[in-house]
Amino acid sequence: MDFYKNISLIIIALMISTDIIAQEEDSNEYIEEVVTATARETTVLDVPYNISTLSGDEITNRAILDNGELLRNFVGISTIDRGYRNAGTTNNIRIRGLNVDSSALQDYPVSAVASVSTYVDKTPIFANFLLRDLKRVEVLRGPQGTLYGSGALGGTIRYITNDPMLGVSEGSVLYTTTAVNGSESVGNAVDVVYNMPLEDKVAYRLVASYLDYPGVTDYVNVFRTGNLPDVGAGPSYGVPIPSDGVGYPDFYTSPPAIYTAEDADTVEIAFMRHKFLFDITNNLDLVFSAAMQDDDVGGRRQASTGTRYVLNDDCVSLFAAGCYSESTYGEYENGALMLEPSSRDVSMYSLELTYDGNGYTAILSQSSHEKTGNNTTDNTGYFAGLGTFTSPIAGYFNDFFGVGGIFGTPARPYAVAERQYTNEADTTEFKIVSDIGEKFDFVVGTFMQEEDQHRAQQTYIKGSNMWNYYYWGVDYVVDANEQDFDYMVSESITNSATYGELTYHSSENFDVTFGWRRFSVEADANMNMSFKLYDVGPATDESSNKDSGTLKKVKDRKSVV
């Protein structure tokens, strides 16, 4: 990350000069948009389904900064924009309203395949890479199952990056500063693009970006935490600190130490892409690409609603009258009791070998990617809403003897959820694409992907050990870390397919496309779950599933002249 922080020094070191070329364009001239949605270069008007594009130059000129803003430029697409914290975790893109998972599933990746597939060049991956040095973005609306397979029920979004250019040495540096409502800080972003020839038939293209955006959300109820000494129940870690100490009865009655974390949802992203082009022969090219991105986000970009309970400065006991006063949350205020940071690392490597034959093009694509991430979520409100803290079943802060008073309600409930996930996949695809013929043209191919996913969660009920020690008068420790819930699931998924499309040009203005995709999916999963605070578990389970079938498509296109 330090390398990217110092990337601004490159601006001074390189002193890249930029030639500004003014070009006069006839505003009445129609410019055909070339796309590759059908695996061959063709115009938008010749594609037999609904497609929209946005060029990389348009993305830059419109100062589009993120994927949520990009998709708002296309008709018929919606996405839930909760900021960078959740942007790379779950694919919630919807085309024509079609969705698979609940909109509430944002903090955690899920097993289900999304309804809209995303590709970076020819690699199927949902990565939320920065929108840097793109040639164009293609949005294909409607089912794309025959060519793009699983996850393309609603459509497909393709991010096409710029290839290296042979014999060209040029570069650019772009510095962007931003200001947002709700924050007094200024955001900064630096982008470097450099294209250089290595030999007559080899070229290299570098894209490096670093952005540091300020937050706008104020966490106004953050508990100060620390470690509790061993008074008989063992030491406890990361527990909300009572203002008046941890003795009895202060541990029960003392108000928490609260502070406000202003502009907590900061965003820091470092991105780099290397791309090599090898012009092996006149009709054989090899492109190697490697892209990496690291995200660090300070908190959730979400404002709280409802009543805000403000701890008064003169409060000495949580059970005294007037300890709290009621207020309302401001426009950019969040009431979580803890900061909710997240981090994510994603890397992608791909090889694309293209052979331009006599009347056809053969393309072999090999790619791999890896995504890892973790985040913290405040589960306190969720537990409180269910009545879990004082439930006789859960037993965290249960007044078993019905004493009431200071034992009736936990003083400083604090439930932390720590989540981690990884996703790895290797993908191979080979296809033959015919040139556009007078009567017929076709695409045939094979696809294979092996994917491994891992997800885990640990939930902690902080302060429960000491609370129960004082209540019961004995060592009540079941788990030294006060961990309530431990969950882990691992999955291995193999997806293979053969597919094809045949287009018949019955006339100059009418085409019919027939498509099919024969697929096979195998999925193995194992789960491990335990409730450590009750000393229950682990419970384990394994499952295996297989599915296969054939997708079929018939699509007509009529040109109106």
Model-derived segments and their meaning:
Residues M1-E25:
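Cleavable N-terminal targeting peptides that direct proteins into the secretory/outer-membrane pathway or into
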Residues E25-S27, I31, S52, T123, ...:
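Membrane-proximal, glycine/serine-rich, low-complexity loop/turn segments characteristic
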Residues N28-L166:
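Acidic, small-polar-rich N-terminal luminal/periplasmic segments of exported/outer-membrane proteins
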Residues G83, G145, T161, T178-G182, ...:
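Outer-membrane beta-barrel proteins
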Residues G182-G298, T422-T428, I432-Q449, T494-T503, ...:
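Transmembrane beta-barrel wall of Gram-negative outer-membrane proteins
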Residues V216-E262, R300-L337, D378-E418, Q458-M488, ...:
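Solvent-exposed loop segments that connect transmembrane elements
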Residues R344-T372, R412-Y534, D547-K555:
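Face-selective signature of the C-terminal outer-membrane beta-barrel domain
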Residues K558-V561:
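Conserved small/polar residues in nucleotide/adenosyl-binding loops
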